[in-house]
Amino acid sequence: KQSGYELYSDYFFDTVTIITKDKTDQIFNNALAQKVNIRKVNSEMLSVSFDEKKNVYRANQLLKIFNCAESIKENPTENLPNLPKNLLRTSTYLDHQVFNSYHSETEMLRYLKRLEEKDIALNRSMIALGSCTMKLNAVAEMIPITWREFSEPHPFAPIEQMEGFRTLFTDLKNWLRSITGFSGVSLQPNAGAQGEYAGLMVIRKYHLERGESNRNVCLIPSSAHGTNPASAQMVGMKVVVVNCDKQGNVDFEDLKKKVEAHSENLGALMVTYPSTHGVFEEKISDICELVHKHGGQVYMDGANLNALVGIAKPGNFGPDVCHINLHKTFCIPHGGGGPGMGPIACKRHLEIYLPSHPVIKDCGPATGIGPVSAAPWGSSSILSISWMYIKMMGSEGLKLATQIAILNANYVAHKLKNHFPILYKGTNGNVAHECIIDIRSIKNDTGVTEEDIAKRLIDFGFHAPTMSWPVPGTMTVSYTHLTLPTNC
């Protein structure tokens, strides 16, 4: 301000935006010449972000870049009021006893150890959570995320400075194309639900560009993940539920009725394959063909892609777009709620609508739907985990992992079927990647609930399966490739 610049806002946290007018390009080039990255917001504004590692030397370097005569002396004592008074916190914080009970490193260490001993993780037990695909988080996969080359680059760093990341992005996209059979891939979505949102936005734009804005009906089977109808609502689509039959498949006759009833306005069908009921939809290609016949597009929820890798490619049996949970099928650890990555893959006719970004222009097509995530390539620092997994496994290893996952699910179902009913099976009597154990009759006869069984498993050191989902009163079990049948 003392040098004549105006701030875009006097209120800021870690990023300051400066109105630079006709000096913008000169200052931006000054910064590049000194190997300092600042953001060019537009032709008249620049922004600078700070973290805890920035010091007085760096601050003075920035002042020189902005051609300021002033400098900051060591240990400045002045603070600018950078937050409005009505947003300042007045209540107390960190009041819980735990924040005021441990005052030495040893006490803290022992407290953390006590918490760890109460936990059940992969270092103690297999994790059989149905629909979660808890795969091996190998040390070799995880090490690269600790390297500063992956952890420090800013998402908006100039692309010419990110050749290593660009190679990683290219490899992953090519591998995902090969695995899924689709033509286009976007790495931007940050989670499976965000992948759903992105895929449906792509479908919506496809219809809009064809002058069919009326196509806003989204058919969703009753077995779907709860995120499916939520994503459809978020993109402005009307949800119509399709029933499932007694075997857990999409009721094809009910689908016919719904498709014909909404033919003029049919936008999309969201279908999970294999289904959340743990069965392969034998009519999946017929389902896709029917929707296409009535002008709709097919979105495949890729939550269960772990049952397909190396065996079947979604791009070859009907769907137009799907998301890929890298945190499930491709081994990014996601216990405790994150982090996730949900790239989408699509057929050629939808490629031009994939997510783009206003800051990093070439992360997607100029004709795309715009950003669905703050960063152009999502949580790019964890993509190295999936890169390592795919690279080390190779095509044969990936196929074997799928086969073992399906074998394990069927092994468990076979061993339990005489004691606990398996709710859904395919026509050959087998399940896909997971099985649903029906506890309801036991509950009615004895009062023992699925929650009681889960807690008892925990008592014996086993991680509990998924309870009461997708069917209340059941337990869904999914053993991936990391568990031997002897452990099942």
Residue ranges of model-derived segments:
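Conserved PLP-binding catalytic core of the aspartate aminotransferase-like
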Residues: S3-L32, F50-K54, P421-D459, T474-M475, ...
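Conserved PLP-enzyme active-site core in the AAT-like
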Residues: T17-I18, G164-R166, Q194-I360, G364-G368, ...
